[in-house]
Amino acid sequence: MRPLTWSTPKPLLPVAGRPMLAHVMDTLVDAGVDHVTLITGYLGDEIVSWVRKEYPGIRTDFAVQEKTDGLASAVLLAGEYTDDGPTMVVLGDTLFSADLSVLRGETRNMIVTSPVEDPSRFGVVLLEEGRVVRLIEKPSEPVSNLAIVGVYYFASGERLMEGCRTLVEKGQRTRGEFQLTDAMELMLRNGEPFGILDIDGWYDCGKPETLLETNRVLLDRNGPGETPELIRSRVIQPC
């Protein structure tokens, strides 16, 4: 995302007049989430300051990922703030439209998905008779068009941490990183049930050109703002 992120961390880049992270945080608040742990890296202090200022009523914890070695590794950093209750993982630059409150009380692990034209850019879900049977990170050959959008629900935070910890201890990397998709695949093989929540409202912010398109879509969706009324205005014609 250079040069946009030279001076601003990606989650704070503006989309439709607000930082990406604001859209994400609002969705979590609407779903009843009251405790958020943020994993930061580049320019992380700016994210910490912004969250504390904008969301003072939410319990927030922060951890720093010094080395960018994958999402599963980042999730492990939140382990000390996570109990055995339901836990969500949401990427800070993932914009989506979904009612996450439907996940309350869900006993399965749930993956939010959306159909895409180019699944090679994403982790994907393979279904058989409506059941999740395999999770594949950025497949080289098309096996499914159901992309993992970066929103996950886990019925047990403790079992999530166990899956990520096992992956890291085994040294199992994909494209040089510890992928959360691979950790979930290990959980699936160990009998953990997974379901999907399929949505259409997913907005890609991975590249500058898609960020511009997402900005346009969200502005169109929200409709035009009110036009201010000018009191006692005068128009001065050019000479």
Give the role of each language-model region.
Residues 12, 125-127, 196:
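A structural signal for short hydrophobic beta-strand segments in well-ordered beta-sheet cores
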Residues 158-159, 165-239:
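Left-handed beta-helix
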Residues 91-92, 199:
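A secondary-structure boundary/capping signal
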Residues 6, 13-14, 18-91, 100:
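Conserved N-terminal catalytic core of the sugar/cofactor nucleotidyltransferase
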Residues 38, 89, 111-112, 196:
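Structural beta-sheet core signal
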Residues 95-171:
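Conserved core of the sugar-phosphate nucleotidyltransferase
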